[in-house]
Amino acid sequence: TGSVLKKETVSLNAMWGVLFTLILILYMGLRPVSVYFGDTVNYAKGFYTAANSRDPFSWQWEGEWLFYNLMQWFARYSDIHTFFLLCATVYIGSLWLAMQRIFKGYYYIPFLVILSMFTFWSYGVNGIRNGMGASLFILAMTYVNRPPVMIGLCVLAAGIHKSIYLMVGAGTLTWFIKNSYWYLAGWMACVGVSYAIGGRIQAYL
């Protein structure tokens, strides 16, 4: 542990962290469109449908507005690999920046822990919107002392995936309610709601 925390090792890890992050973004973002990457093919199908549409691009504010506006724009003016590269940059880059803000020069090891999670790759190539939204929300939480930035990032995250509204709501509650017993009661209530109408809630999200 001592060698990991040495100044020389920390500097080296920081350098390798940047290089490894860039390589990983390129590797994930420039992947081929294949069924081996889960919903990548479904996103590609929607992308090509938009690319072949004759309707002019117009900004929409409904649903997951940010993600689909970006997809529509890239479908008309760029290509799918550049779009997936942007998605990977947001997904991985937000996590990288969040770890840097939390752990400063010692971010490399925590960042590697995130990359080693079994869900990491899946959220990057399969549940793309989920991964991007969650990463932006994690980054937003590092700006808790700068509310305008935090709120702005939360708005962008929710514009990528609607499930982020749940996390934003939970974060808002912790801002005002400090008594942990209320959270226990809320958790028990959520179990009941999930049992009663969980299917309808999941379908909406």
Give, region by region, the residue ranges found by the protein language model.
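Short acidic/glycine- and proline-prone juxtamembrane loop motifs at membrane-interface regions
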Residues: 124-131
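Short hydrophobic/aromatic helix or loop-helix immediately within or flanking a transmembrane segment
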Residues: 41-52, 56-78
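Membrane-interface transmembrane helices that cradle and orient dolichyl/undecaprenyl
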Residues: 137-149
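Transmembrane-helix motifs of polytopic, lipid-linked glycan transferases
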Residues: 86-103
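Start-transfer (signal-anchor) and selected internal transmembrane alpha helices
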Residues: 1-24
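Membrane-interface alpha helices of multi-pass inner-membrane proteins
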Residues: 149-173
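Alpha-helical transmembrane segments and terminal signal-anchor/GPI-anchor hydrophobic tails
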Residues: 41-44, 171-205
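Transmembrane-helix signature of polytopic, membrane-embedded enzymes
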Residues: 99-117
